[in-house]
């Protein structure tokens, strides 16, 4: 919407302000409007890049490089005097007793005469007394031609048992010689197994195979239409029970055959 004032110049509604005009109104998010199709402007002033939020610690002159890659020797504090070793009173007392001094009044003068008897430092004690590390065998110099470990050609019993007494040549591994040897051995075994001089051993049949073969042989037998054998005295006797020749049981009951009617007629007579 464009408003036309009396002067004839057009002005946008958002530029029209009523009342007091302040510069802070341009930074007020409640009054500022984003132009159409643009991002809303930032309404706060960023601090200068040199401003640091929070506490700024002092830079440590000794960084990671000085700690990990630079070796610094120990420097004694200048304000402290060098600590001198104290007198070895146990040794002085033994020496005084060996000299025939047995009273406490004679000990101060004896200690002044033997002021050089001091306690040994830890470095002096370790240097004088043999340690466990000093008893370990030393490695001979390389100029003597000594060999440490086992040579490259040595094969243990476990390696010999698993991979053979010798290492296979790299030439055979690259050229596939062992693969060709495996194929040749299998072809020789196949040719030896298919020879005519070897007798054929048929497989042993199981009970299931025998049962199937017997049923198939009975099924494939031709039908025998000959009259079944009977004794001469039974040839003139009629059958008492008819032979079931197929069909459903219900049909045989509802529609009996001629022989069944004859058998039913003779049943009450018996």
Swiss-Prot record:
First-listed, main subcellular location of the protein, grouped into a coarse class: other
Disordered as annotated region, ranges: 128-148, 215-270
Comp. bias intervals (Acidic residues): 258-270
InterPro entries hit by this protein: CFAP77
Biased composition (Polar residues): 128-145
UniProt-listed Pfam families: CFAP77
GO cellular component: motile cilium
UniProt superkingdom: Eukaryota
Subcellular location(s) per record: Cell projection, Cilium, Flagellum
Keywords: Cell projection, Cilium, Flagellum
Free-text function comment from the UniProt entry: Microtubule inner protein (MIP) part of the dynein-decorated doublet microtubules (DMTs) in cilia axoneme, which is required for motile cilia beating.
Family of the protein in this entry: Belongs to the CFAP77 family.
Name the record gives this protein: Cilia- and flagella-associated protein 77
Lineage: Eukaryota, Viridiplantae, Chlorophyta, core chlorophytes, Chlorophyceae
Gene: CFAP77
């Amino acid at each position: 919407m464009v408003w036309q004032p009396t002067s004839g110049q057009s002005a946008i509604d958002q530029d029209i302000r009523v009342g007091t005009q302040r510069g802070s109104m341009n930074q007020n998010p409640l009054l500022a409007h984003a132009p159409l199709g643009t991002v809303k402007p930032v309404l706060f002033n960023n601090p200068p890049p040199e401003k640091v939020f929070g506490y700024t610690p002092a830079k440590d002159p000794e960084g990671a490089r000085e700690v990990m890659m630079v070796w610094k020797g120990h420097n004694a504090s200048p304000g402290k005097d060098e600590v001198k070793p104290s007198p070895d009173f146990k040794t002085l007392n033994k020496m005084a007793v060996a000299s025939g001094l047995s009273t406490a009044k004679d000990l101060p003068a004896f200690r002044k005469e033997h002021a050089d008897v001091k306690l040994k430092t830890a470095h002096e004690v370790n240097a004088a007394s043999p340690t466990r590390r000093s008893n370990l065998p030393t490695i001979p110099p390389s100029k003597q031609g000594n060999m440490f470990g086992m040579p490259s050609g040595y094969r243990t019993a476990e390696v010999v048992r698993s991979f053979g007494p010798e290492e296979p040549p790299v030439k055979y591994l690259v050229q596939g010689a062992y693969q060709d040897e495996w194929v040749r051995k299998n072809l020789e075994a196949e040719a030896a197994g298919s020879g005519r001089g070897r007798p054929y051993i048929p497989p042993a049949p199981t009970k299931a195979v025998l049962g199937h073969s017997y049923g198939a042989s009975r099924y494939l037998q031709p039908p025998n239409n000959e009259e079944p054998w009977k004794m001469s005295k039974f040839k003139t006797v009629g059958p008492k029970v008819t032979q079931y020749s197929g069909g459903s049981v219900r049909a045989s009951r509802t529609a009996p055959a001629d022989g069944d009617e004859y058998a039913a007629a003779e049943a009450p007579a018996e």
